[in-house]
Regions:
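A membrane-cytosol interface segment of integral membrane proteins
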Residues: 98-118
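Soluble C-terminal extramembrane regulatory/interaction domains of multi-pass membrane proteins
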Residues: 130-152
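Transmembrane-cytosolic junction motif
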Residues: 15-42
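Feature marks short, highly hydrophobic, charge-poor N-terminal signal-anchor/signal peptide-like helices
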Residues: 1-9
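Acidic, Ser/Thr-rich low-complexity segments on the non-lumenal side of membrane proteins
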Residues: 43-74
């Protein structure tokens, strides 16, 4: 009798683990399908659904939302997403990824002030080579400095 209970518990555990992974992958596939088809309403609705909130942490959902707004080219929502994500708790790898993504976005938008703020934040978390590269890009494109011509 004890073996039957143990076997049943093991089977139930395996089914739950496999089932949740399948469900999570199913949600991700639906998100990708909506994004590829340009169905942003369905994409954002699925991001806000209870299963998505259960399986994906807030940072991941907001990062996916940001990518949706970038594909949609909704500048106001992109800025709101960057503000929200940059204020969230995240590990250094996530923070560096978001800071660099925001830096290049605001570089395209010619926003000196925001790029400068992001460069300062980047200096606290990134390798010197990354910050130096971004500093050079900032100086050339936004400050219009020509002092790097000899180095190139």
């Amino acid at each position: 009798m004890d073996y039957k209970i143990i076997i049943l518990a093991v089977v139930i555990t395996i089914v739950l683990i496999v089932g949740t992974q399948v469900w999570k992958q199913s949600i991700l596939k639906k998100l990708l399908k909506h994004m590829q088809q340009g169905d942003f309403n369905a994409y954002f609705k699925l991001l806000d659904s209870l299963p998505c909130k259960y399986f994906y942490p807030p940072f991941n959902r907001e990062y996916m939302r940001l990518n949706g707004y970038i594909m949609k080219a909704d500048k106001k929502k992109i800025e709101e997403c960057f503000e929200l994500i940059l204020s969230m708790r995240m590990n250094k790898k996530q923070e560096l990824d978001v800071v660099i993504k925001a830096f290049y976005y605001y570089l395209d938008e010619d926003s000196k002030k925001k790029c400068k703020t992001l460069l300062e934040r980047m200096k606290k978390i990134a390798d010197e080579s990354i910050t130096q590269e971004c500093q050079v890009i900032y100086d050339i494109l936004l400050e219009e400095k020509t002092s790097y011509i000899d180095d190139m």
